From Swiss-Prot:
Source species: Homo sapiens
Alphabetical UniProt keywords: DNA-binding, Nucleus, Transcription, Transcription regulation
InterPro entries documented for this protein: Fork_head_dom, FOX_domain-containing, TF_fork_head_CS_2, WH-like_DNA-bd_sf, WH_DNA-bd_sf
Disordered: annotated span: 1-46, 62-104, 204-232
Top-level taxonomy: Eukaryota, Metazoa, Chordata, Craniata, Vertebrata
Subcellular location: Nucleus
Protein's name in the database: Forkhead box protein D4
GO biological process, any: anatomical structure morphogenesis
Length: 439
């Protein structure tokens, strides 16, 4: 059947058939060739149908058939022979593989963390160090590493037996340290990590209890903590001065307590007066700060007392009829006791208040002189001498009050006989600055 068509036609003998008349007739070769063509087409179709199941089985199995099977035309009779190597392994192989996996340790996560912390040299570890110890010690957790790391973190945060220790600033690394509470050492029975006695709970301090101070408190701080101090605490600390009790102080000015609404301008103690004060704080306790000298209540009372005495003597001396006081710049020139009005630095006009006081005193003196002239009796020499003595005594009192302050200075008498000595008020720069401040 595989021979060429021309050779088959040549080799095929011509059949001789007799007709009904008995004569030999020739066979039509064309009709035989058509039959052979039909047979050949049918055989070719049969081969294709027989090869199709083999191809489908090969496609199902996922492998290509060799060329010899296709050319031979013989397909496998059982399609189940293909893909046998892709079947699931038997149950015995799966059981043997499970038997090879390591078993889970019987210890809990708290026991594993405690084991990791106790084996460290410093008895503290970070979260990564605890996980590394568990992975190296137990192969079961080595195969399932990412799953149980969160469980370790939660057990560290939720159990009171673990204490977080912050990392030192200069120590390299990341994360805080974890350690065991010293009171939780007997958490497990006889050191066995398989069984825990009870859940450890840290004792919380009561709300009313105060923690002991690591350092002794000063007297003022102790008085604040204890509203009813006993006899051992000693006297309470002196009250601190109020910030708004002093005026704005500048360079070269000394603060003073405003005890009177109109403080004296020239009654201020300078540095030598402070230096001459007795040193009372030599034997005092060094821990108790000494109050500022100008803020001492005794000094303030003494200043107020001296101010009142100074004002009283000033009024008494102003009422003396034997003295004539003239203010510089007032336009009147009379002999006798002369007082110069101090002018602060930078001031352009003379002291108006002192000029007004001088005018008032002059008017009173003129009135007394007119009364004496009306009575017809001139002032005697004794009266003049008494006035001089009263002026000298007043000057001595001024010097006693302002001793060491450099406020007053006695000058040589001006004029001849019968004239009063002249004293000039020469304020220091500090007193000038104080007088320029708010009164």
């Amino acid at each position: 059947m595989n021979l060429p068509r021309a050779e088959r036609l040549r080799s095929t003998p011509q059949r001789s058939l007799r007709d009904s008349d008995g004569e030999d007739g020739k066979i039509d070769v064309l009709g035989e060739e058509e039959d052979e063509d039909e047979e050949e087409a049918a055989s070719q179709q049969f081969l294709e149908q027989s090869l199709q199941p083999g191809l489908q089985v090969a496609r199902w199995g996922g492998v290509a058939l060799p060329r010899e099977h296709i050319e031979g035309g013989g397909g496998p009779s059982d399609p189940s022979e293909f893909g046998t190597e892709f079947r699931a392994p038997p149950r015995s192989a799966a059981a043997s593989e499970d038997a090879r996996q390591p078993a889970k340790p019987p210890s809990s996560y708290i026991a594993l963390i405690t084991m990791a912390i106790l084996q460290s040299p410093h008895k503290r570890l970070t979260l990564s160090g605890i996980c590394a110890f568990i992975s190296d010690r137990f192969p079961y957790y080595r195969r399932k590493f990412p799953a149980w790391q969160n469980s370790i973190r939660h057990n560290l945060s939720l159990n009171d037996c673990f204490v977080k220790i912050p990392r030192e600033p200069g120590r390299p690394g990341k994360g805080n340290y974890w350690s065991l509470d010293p009171a939780s050492q007997d958490m497990f029975d006889n050191g066995s990590f398989l069984r825990r006695r009870k859940r450890f709970q840290r004792h919380q301090p009561t709300p009313g209890a105060h923690l002991p101070h690591p350092f002794p408190l000063p007297a003022a701080h102790a008085a604040l903590h204890n509203p009813r101090p006993g006899p051992l605490l000693g006297a309470p600390a002196p009250p601190q001065p109020v910030p708004g009790a002093y005026p704005n102080t500048g360079p070269g000015r000394r603060p003073y307590a405003l005890l009177h609404p109109h403080p004296p301008r020239y009654l201020l103690l300078s540095a030598p007066a402070y230096a001459g004060a007795p040193k009372k704080a030599e034997g005092a306790d060094l821990a108790t700060p000494a109050p500022f000298p100008c803020c001492s209540p005794h000094l303030v009372l003494s200043l107020g007392r001296r101010a009142r005495v100074w004002r009283r003597h000033r009024e008494a001396d102003a009422s003396l009829s034997a003295l004539r006081v003239s203010c510089k710049g007032s336009g009147e020139r009379v002999q006798g006791l002369r007082r110069v009005c101090p002018r602060p630095r930078g001031a352009t006009a003379p002291c108006s208040s002192d000029r007004q006081a001088c005018r008032t005193i002059l008017q009173q003196q003129q009135r007394h002189q007119e009364e004496d002239c009306a009575n017809g009796c001139a002032p005697t020499k004794g009266a003049v001498l008494g006035g001089h003595l009263s002026a000298a005594s007043a000057l001595l009192r001024y010097q006693a009050v302002a001793e060491g302050s450099g406020l007053t200075s006695l000058a040589a008498p001006l004029g001849g006989e019968g004239t009063s000595p002249v004293f000039l008020v020469s304020p220091t720069p500090s007193s000038l600055a104080e007088s320029a401040g708010p009164s």
